[in-house]
């Protein structure tokens, strides 16, 4: 018996396809165009980044220089200094526009009340959560005990009815099978063909 050989199709390898793509002049033009766009974009970004020099020192060096107690004392001292200082300078630049001079540098009492309420917020939230949990327990204990008793009674009665129905059906089926199996009747009806 002679085997029939099916000619296999030769598939081009991926490297050959890449070479064909590069030989295509339209593809070359697209590649050159995209490279030009990328170079223009990245040169704009690099120009902007050199325009604004910034201090990029690691956070660990900055945070290591100031301890927690020093930071707290600076924060507390700065709030007192703000009330007594008539002149406030912004650190961005030393132009006359950035310097604010005012004799009436006051802190509104409502803002200090807001700050105090923000400080006391976690304690009040915890106390509210505790009260809510106690109320939930009280309400659930009253409602659940009455509701659970009612549900238990309904389920128990339903289970008893289903069980009684099943037992009666089993007894009736047993009686029918018991009495009908012993009799032999003569066949009455059309004869089989």
UniProtKB/Swiss-Prot annotation:
Parts of the chain that traverse the membrane: 161-181
**In what ranges is there compositional bias, type Basic and acidic residues?**
18-35
Question: Where does it primarily localize?
Answer: nucleus
Question: Which membrane topology term applies here?
Answer: Single-pass membrane protein
Provide GO CC annotations from the record. Answer: nuclear envelope; nuclear membrane
Is Zinc-finger given among the entry's keywords? no
Which portions of the sequence form the region Disordered? Answer: 15-35
Q: Name it.
A: Protein SINE3
Q: What gene, per UniProt, encodes this protein?
A: SINE3
